[in-house]
Amino acid sequence: MSASDASQANMEADVAPAASHAERRALLATCVAAAARAAEVVRAGAERRASLTCESKGRFDFVSDVDRASEAALGDVIRQRHPDATLLAEEGSPDAGATRGLVFVADPLDGTTNFLHGLPWYAVSIAALVDGVPAAGAIINVPTGALFTATAGGGARHAGAPMRVSEIADPARALIATGFPFTREEEIARYVPMLPAVMRATSGIRRAGAAALDLADVACGRYEAFWELRLSPWDIAAGILLIREAGGIVTTLDGAPCPVAVTSCVAGNPSMHRWLIDTLVNREP
């Protein structure tokens, strides 16, 4: 995929939503307030981690009562401010089929396994979509309190300052993030051969266990690029907007605009995004 193709894909996916600047700012305020309330619930849950109830949703995929309480808390904030909006959230939202109008897409605890093991790397992620297009988004790193925000056409910010993707274009200087497809055997077989090609050419690969934070760290220039083969809407909705507004590119593995759906995801600064797709698709057997 050429640089112009990737840029065009990014532009096509980043059409301004049917909302004014003031409306997008209001949606961002809701995202931030809801994420902050959910983060409070998660922090309180961390203090009683040993007594939490935890269930398996599938192969190595877990949910705790903190996930559910966090989702309920953020849902309360959203419904108070936008009673007609739809909530699409990870832990069984009844509105999961809706895509039109105003939809809030939320992961109440991204990095549940990290949380359950006491690893301080997990987040709350919320995006507001207008007719399927991200209009505003917020990600909170719960243990550190770091806040990442963006509005469509209004830029991305971290700790109150504008965010920009890294300018590193040399793979040898690049740090790449990824996520393992651990829940699906067929995806593991597809993914594992990708690692050597990236590992040989870059300064390192990191797998931290929370896709929302990986995307936020691409947006603020800590990582040069990120890829994962299968992500859900709540994993990427806010992160997609952060990266685009920070000057980066987000597509599927085949270079198409990255939808807010179950999808593959390749993200990065323009140079490293192009390099990563070329490397993943054209790697040696």
Regions found by a protein language model. Give the residues of each.
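Small-residue (primarily alanine) positions within well-ordered alpha-helices
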Residues: 31, 35-38, 137, 156, ...
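Residue-level signal for inorganic ion chemistry
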Residues: 42-45, 67, 78, 112, ...
